[in-house]
């Protein structure tokens, strides 16, 4: 199974129609159905939907994984674990992960901190109309430009030392400075080389609101 879309909520109009599997998270299940897309797996505690909506979800979903509200995982974390358990080699794109509650937003950014999701770090991306977020483990990586985006930022997680080569604003031993987020960098008609000695790297492609 190649590509999985997980809709966590938010704007569903950006959702491509060519994913192999569609997973709805809580209220995101209804947005999938509203777009006429299949609801292959419904995941969540469903505390944000009415009883009528929950009956609709149960009727139309091919599989329902309902959790209790009091749990260690967020609904999105649970959805990712369910998806990778069923399709361990899939590439997963998460839509609707950047809006809503700030605590959920931060949890979504740091998904690979969960040891159950860490093995799939390079298979997860988070997307909305203005941003695309991917992850890389410690080591050396070549980062390709995204033609749809204007900027790229790098956030090392885990107190690792980051080096950036081939970008408009390089970062190396001679000019090193410590920041939580190295934002607003740009490509120079070539891939960017990054290296991180420990932890993992959050890479954020972005563009200005148009």
Each language-model region and where it sits:
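General beta-strand structural signal in soluble alpha/beta enzymes
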Residues: 7, 23-25, 66, 125-128
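Anionic-ligand-binding alpha/beta catalytic cores of soluble enzymes and soluble regulatory domains
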Residues: 91-139
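Short coil/turn segments at beta-strand junctions that form active-site/ligand-binding loops
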Residues: 1-2, 20, 88-91, 122
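N-terminal beta-strand-loop-alpha-helix module at the start
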Residues: 1-57
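Long, charged alpha-helical interface segments
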Residues: 129-131, 136-210
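Short phosphate-binding loop-to-helix
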Residues: 64-87
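A glycine-rich helix N-cap at a beta->alpha junction
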Residues: 60-68, 119-125, 147-155, 159-161
């Amino acid at each position: 199974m190649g590509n999985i879309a997980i809709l966590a909520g938010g704007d569903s109009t950006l959702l491509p129609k060519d994913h192999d599997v569609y997973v709805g998270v809580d209220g995101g299940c209804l947005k999938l159905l509203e777009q006429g897309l299949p609801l292959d797996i419904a995941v969540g505690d469903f505390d944000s939907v009415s009883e009528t909506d929950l009956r609709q979800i149960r009727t139309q979903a091919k599989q329902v994984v309902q959790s209790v509200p009091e749990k260690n995982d967020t609904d999105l974390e649970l959805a990712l674990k369910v998806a990778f358990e069923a399709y361990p080699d899939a590439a997963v794109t998460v839509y609707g992960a950047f809006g809503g509650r700030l605590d959920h937003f931060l949890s979504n950014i740091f998904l690979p901190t969960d040891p159950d999701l860490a093995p799939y770090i390079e298979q997860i991306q988070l997307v909305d109309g203005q941003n695309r977020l991917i992850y890389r483990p410690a080591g050396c990586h070549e980062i390709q430009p995204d033609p749809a985006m204007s900027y790229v930022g790098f956030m090392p997680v885990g107190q690792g030392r980051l080096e950036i080569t081939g970008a408009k604003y390089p970062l190396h031993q001679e000019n090193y400075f410590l920041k939580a987020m190295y934002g607003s960098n740009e490509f120079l008609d070539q891939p960017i080389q990054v290296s991180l000695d420990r932890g993992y790297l959050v890479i954020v492609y972005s563009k200005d609101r148009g």
